[in-house]
């Protein structure tokens, strides 16, 4: 079965892709009648060397993404994974020659079709009197024994574009550029690994891998690698790759040693997530520095892909200061990353976090009667939530991911562990603030954030007073914060429904002579009734709002949990 691709037609996909790049980049132009993209300011290159590269499409952003001042002059593209036509290569050479350039360097990846077609175009151009040189780049470090065809051209070719581009921009001559980039090419290596294959538009995947296998040492055309290995962690795979690339018994190894300075390139082969790319980059930095290698520059991104292949390649280039200046030279190429000219190794990568604000001393003695009462309340709340874990999870399965009970139990266990460390603060404001921090760190999910918001806001009115009116104001402040940031309102089938109903009853605490337990009892009953009523509501906020109301036949688990917490508080205060 062929894979799905967002194309207009299989036959025209390479042309459409190149046209799209040029349409969105005013620095590029198409060469009419050919699958060629050129700098739009060719006239500015008079008296300088032009740089042309290319190959099959499907490796984007290579190579057209690297056209620009300080990199390539133009690119000739073939169909997907197919070498470009000789006629188009020759047309590109003629176009840059007519613009007044003093010679053209062809930068070619080491594949038979590319060598033949670029080589033939070069000979035809030279027969016309156009000075043309060609460098063939092979940076593949997969094969331990060199084959007659030589090393394949991989992502390291992009570094050659950069070095050659900087030299050309500086006015260096054609033969000297060719000489220097040939030296640079011998100081680098690339190795790829993939979780699965890719598929050319209109075709099936090029190879199959089982679920527990990855392909090591594969090329950029979907061809199989040198061996298959068992799936492992990112750290383990990176170590294996670097071991292979630097093993001196490997005929295509990179001669990296402790003390070596390198440019490190982590390349997405097309289908890897940015999350995985970051993990691989971190693993590569740690592994190289653990070997005593200095990372002068780190390039992480998609440079040379293989369509949608979910894999990466690692490239190492040995550098000295003169070569590093060429890597750092300015370029306008759209796909080249804007990397700071600063060494990665030796750089301070973290800063000390700001200290927590100093708390005022607890106004009531820790371990006193008020503190003990606080501990009893918290213990009852925790045991209540732990007892409700499975019930809340069952309620949550209808509208969420079935973890509401687990989330509340995680909070309960965190509070229990905290209580083992010593008596809680007797100051209500300090207690709520500490609980807020604890729940934000340990509870997780939206519930942790909402309870954290509620408690942080509720603590503020209690800093100056702890009277019943202050507690009512604390409830108001907590509810306001939940509504402001959670975007829920009463009637939206959330925990706010229970808390809001209780908050309305607690307004009575603001009246002179109000009785704590009488008012709180009414508040708890209202919260429980509101929680039960949520089963008849259509969700207006949270994950449940994306679920059909026909499936919401049970009370909202968050509302049930909030009412249960209030009931637990009341029971302790009544005892």
From Swiss-Prot:
Binding site for ATP: 401-404, 446-447, 486, 494-495, 556-558
Needed cofactors: Mg(2+); Mn(2+); Co(2+)
Result, substituting residue 221 to A: Abolishes kinase activity but not FMN cyclase activity
Entries under Pfam families matching the protein: Dak1 (PF02733), Dak2 (PF02734)
Enzyme Commission number, as recorded: 2.7.1.28, 2.7.1.29, 4.6.1.15
GO function term, MF aspect, one: ATP binding
Modified residues (Phosphoserine): 350, 511, 545
One example of a Gene Ontology biological process annotation: glycerol catabolic process
Tissue-specificity statement: Detected in erythrocytes (at protein level).
Cited InterPro entries: DhaK_ATP, DhaK_dom, DhaL_dom, DhaL_dom_sf, Dihydroxyacetone_Kinase
Free-text comment on the cofactor: Manganese or cobalt are requested for FAD-AMP lyase activity.
Catalytic activities: dihydroxyacetone + ATP = dihydroxyacetone phosphate + ADP + H(+); D-glyceraldehyde + ATP = D-glyceraldehyde 3-phosphate + ADP + H(+); FAD = riboflavin cyclic-4',5'-phosphate + AMP + H(+)
Domain DhaL, residue spans: 372-571
Activity regulation (UniProt): Each activity is inhibited by the substrate(s) of the other.
Keywords in alphabetical order: ATP-binding, Cataract, Cobalt, FAD, Flavoprotein, Kinase, Lyase, Magnesium, Manganese, Metal-binding, Multifunctional enzyme, Nucleotide-binding, Phosphoprotein, Transferase
Task of the protein: Catalyzes both the phosphorylation of dihydroxyacetone and of glyceraldehyde, and the splitting of ribonucleoside diphosphate-X compounds among which FAD is the best substrate. Represses IFIH1-mediated cellular antiviral response.
Disease connection: Triokinase and FMN cyclase deficiency syndrome: An autosomal recessive disease characterized by cataracts and developmental delay that may be associated with cerebellar hypoplasia. Additional features may include liver dysfunction, microcytic anemia, and fatal cardiomyopathy with lactic acidosis following a febrile illness.
Domain notes: DhaK and DhaL domains have differential roles, individually DhaK is inactive and DhaL displays cyclase but not kinase activity.
Family membership noted in the UniProt record: Belongs to the dihydroxyacetone kinase (DAK) family.
The protein's name in its UniProt record: Triokinase/FMN cyclase
